[in-house]
């Protein structure tokens, strides 16, 4: 072996050692966490690492702050994993979601924010959720009177029941749900509704049909949650049978546009951007946006 070969090998060895040192350093470097437990106003989030779900108003609202480190994840299960692992300090969610998450995990809590006061700047359309139908569909005109007939008291009572159910999804609630239709006639066909089935308390998957859960098409699992019960009520009032389809968030609107589903009931806000793609009913629920965080040890 000549000197040149030895020199090349030596240089290569040094480079490998340097890469190893840098890699080791980056692996052992820890992110400085921010304690959110004493924060009562959104201004207190400065410098924190906060996440939101991709493609949602939550992410838009978060990006508008400008003083936080923003991360995004494709669904709420990944947001929860990131929070528990310490990758983020908190994430944006509707208050019912926060209530559900906290009820299931005592190590978590949330910042009680109020829209346009201590919290995010948002309109009712931004934080409300509505049913989406294909552009030009006559279903909006049919469903709006049904939604209008659901009182604010019934909506709140149903959400309280749903949050309780979400803490133990396969356990019977032991009481009649606040929103139930008396119509059992399904002669008007089938209503195909898409949702994530992964966004408690609005929609989730469970192993049994407890508490009026609906079998997910093409799956052995059942869907339940606020969206499911609203979908059941709307379908019943229309005299239709209900089918639930589990669909990833980014595929919901394309699937509706393609005619794969009749509607979307998935905790979806009727933002101006989405209104260019689909038609929305009036909102069937409104909520504050809050921040879920992990309690300090």
Model features per residue range: what roles?
Residues 6-18:
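Sec-dependent N-terminal signal peptides
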Residues 22-26:
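C-terminal motif of bacterial Sec signal peptides marking the signal peptidase cleavage site
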Residues 28, 54-57, 121-172, 228-237, ...:
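Extended ligand-binding regions for polar small-molecule ligands
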Residues 28-45, 95-126, 133, 236, ...:
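Acidic, polar ligand-binding/catalytic clefts
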Residues 34-42, 162-189:
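Bacterial Sec-exported substrate-binding components of ABC uptake systems
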Residues 40-43, 56-64, 77-85, 96-103, ...:
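Solvent-exposed, polar/charged alpha-helical surfaces in well-ordered, non-transmembrane soluble domains
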Residues 47-52, 64-85, 94, 188-268, ...:
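Extracytoplasmic small-molecule ligand-binding "clamshell" domains
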Residues 88, 129-132, 145, 216-224:
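Second-shell loop/turn segments in exported
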């Amino acid at each position: 072996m000549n000197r040149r070969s030895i020199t090349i090998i030596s240089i290569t060895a040094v480079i490998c050692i340097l890469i190893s040192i840098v890699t080791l350093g980056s692996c052992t470097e820890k992110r400085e966490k921010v304690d959110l437990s004493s924060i009562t106003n959104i201004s207190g989030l400065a410098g924190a690492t906060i996440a939101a779900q991709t493609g949602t108003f939550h992410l838009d609202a978060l990006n508008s702050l400008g003083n936080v480190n923003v991360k995004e994840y494709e669904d709420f299960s990944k947001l929860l994993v990131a929070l528990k692992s310490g990758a983020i300090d908190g994430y944006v969610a509707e208050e019912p979601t926060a209530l559900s998450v906290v009820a299931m995990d005592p190590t978590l809590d949330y910042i009680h924010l109020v829209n346009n006061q201590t919290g995010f700047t948002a309109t009712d359309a931004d934080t409300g959720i509505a049913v989406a139908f294909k552009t030009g569909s006559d279903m909006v005109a049919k469903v709006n009177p049904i939604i209008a007939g659901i009182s604010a008291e019934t909506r709140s009572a149903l959400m309280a029941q749903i949050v309780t159910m979400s803490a133990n999804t396969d356990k019977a609630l032991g009481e009649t749900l606040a929103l139930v239709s008396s119509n059992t006639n399904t002669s008007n066909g089938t209503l195909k509704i898409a949702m994530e089935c992964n966004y408690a308390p609005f929609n989730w998957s469970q192993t049994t049909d407890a508490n009026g859960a609906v079998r997910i098409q093409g799956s052995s699992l059942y869907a339940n949650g606020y969206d499911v019960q609203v979908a059941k009520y709307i379908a019943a009032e229309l005299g239709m049978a209900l089918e639930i389809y589990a669909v990833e968030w980014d595929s919901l609107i394309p699937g509706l546009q393609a005619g794969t589903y009749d509607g979307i009931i998935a905790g979806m806000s009727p933002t101006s951007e989405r209104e260019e793609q689909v038609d929305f009913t009036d909102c069937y629920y409104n909520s504050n946006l809050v921040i879920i965080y992990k309690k300090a040890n």
